Amino acid sequence: HKIALFITQTGGGCRASNYIHLLRKALEKADLAFVPVISVNLSGLEKNPGWTLTLPMIRKMIYAMMYGDLIVNVANQVRPYELNHGQTDRMVDDWQGKLIDGFQTGKGMSRRQMRENFDRIIADFDTIPVSHEEKVRVGVVGEIYVKFSPLGNNNLEDFLLSEGAE
C-alpha cells in the first residue's frame, strides 16, 4: 500500500470542511479504509501520525497550484474560441504530462525553471488557432465543489460552451 489521499482544510464554516470525513466514509464503503486521508492544514485541525509536512513538500504543492492556476486560466481563455474542437484539452493533457514528469525528476522546481515553463505554456496555448468573435462571458460563483465539479454542477461548463459562452 503506497497511496494516500491529501485534502486541504481551512476549518471554515463551509461544506468543504466536511469533505475529509466524506472521503473516509466513501473509502470505507469501497473496502479501501486502509488508504489514509491526510488533512493538509496550518491550523492543527487534525493530527496525521507518521506523516510530516516538509518544506520541500510545501514548495512542490505551491508550485503545483501555480502551474495548475496558469493552465486553467489560459485554457479557459482559449477553449471557447478554439477553431479545432478539443485542441485546448489536448494541450492541457500534454502539459499535465510534462509537468508530472518534471515533478518526478525535479525539473521545473526552481523559480527560473518555473518562469521558463510559464512562458512556454503561454506560448504553446497561443499557437492554438482561435476565432475573434465576441462571446458572452459567464462567471460561475458559489461553493467550490459546485463551481469546479462537472458532477456537482450538472456539466455546467460544457453546457455554457455549447451555448457559445466564455
Where are the regions a protein language model picked out?
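An N-terminal assembly and electron-transfer interface module characteristic of large anaerobic redox
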Residues: 1-166
